[in-house]
């Protein structure tokens, strides 16, 4: 019998480990504890910011690398990877592997799109923490963390015409937009799948070849699910799946 390859799990947060409306993780607590006890790496892969993810890593007792802002960057704890990470920049207690465009580039693009199209785009940079909290149901402190963005700007977009115009102008500027659970996100072309591949390469170097599992709930997670060995699409509370996902085309 062959030796089983080490397991690495990648998971989205909102709607997957966290309940979509309340952001509670207690239904996942037993599984999270099991991963800690068995020392199975859990790599959080989310649209959330580094500051937001750090809160949940502490709650989960998680010490593994993590992916932020829809693949905008990978953060690797220096404590566990004490040698330089290829492509990484030392930032505090992490090696940061930047994969997306810097936030100031995105904000300049938003301003240009407004100028060229007349769209009344509003992003997190335009909102106070109180307004973000009202839109998302986050606490005020969590809303402040959500505004600490580095690689991705969530935008409030109304209607298909605005969405199409935004996407077209983003492409002209060398950027992309993707639809999340609540907002449209402007970013520099990075995605969760590309970030997952970078993390897998690190684990392959450390552990030899690994088996990867990806868990997500939305179309935004498809790049991650396509990059792993075992993809898992989570149902919504009503038992349905994200209607933007073609189940027949899901990777097997």
Predicted regions and their residues:
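A short, Lys/Arg-enriched amphipathic alpha-helix followed by its capping loop at the start of a domain
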Residues: 3-11, 27-40, 202, 210
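Active-site phosphate-binding/coordination module
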Residues: 25-123
């Amino acid at each position: 019998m062959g030796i089983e390859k080490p397991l690495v799990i990648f998971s989205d947060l909102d709607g997957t480990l966290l309940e979509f409306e309340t952001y509670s993780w207690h239904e996942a607590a037993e599984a999270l504890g099991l991963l800690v006890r068995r020392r199975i790496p859990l790599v959080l892969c989310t649209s959330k910011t580094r500051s937001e993810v750090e809160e949940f890593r502490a709650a989960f007792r998680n010490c593994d690398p993590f992916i932020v802002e829809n693949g905008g960057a990978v953060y690797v704890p220096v404590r566990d990877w004490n040698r330089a990470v290829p492509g990484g920049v030392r930032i505090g207690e992490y090696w940061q592997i930047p994969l997306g465009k810097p936030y100031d580039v995105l904000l300049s693009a938003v301003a240009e799109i407004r100028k060229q199209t007349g769209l009344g785009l509003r992003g997190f940079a335009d909102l106070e923490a109180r307004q973000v909290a009202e839109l998302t149901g986050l606490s005020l402190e969590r809303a402040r963390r959500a505004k600490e963005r580095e690689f991705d700007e969530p935008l409030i977009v109304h209607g298909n015409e605005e969405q199409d115009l935004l996407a077209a102008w983003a492409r002209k500027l060398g950027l992309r937009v993707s639809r999340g659970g609540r907002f449209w996100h402007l970013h520099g072309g990075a995605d969760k799948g590309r970030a997952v591949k970078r993390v897998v390469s690190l684990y392959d170097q450390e552990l030899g070849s690994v088996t990867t599992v990806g868990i997500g709930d939305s179309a935004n997670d498809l790049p991650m699910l396509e990059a792993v060995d075992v993809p898992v699409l989570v149902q919504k509370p009503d038992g349905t799946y994200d209607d933007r996902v073609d189940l027949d085309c899901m990777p097997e």
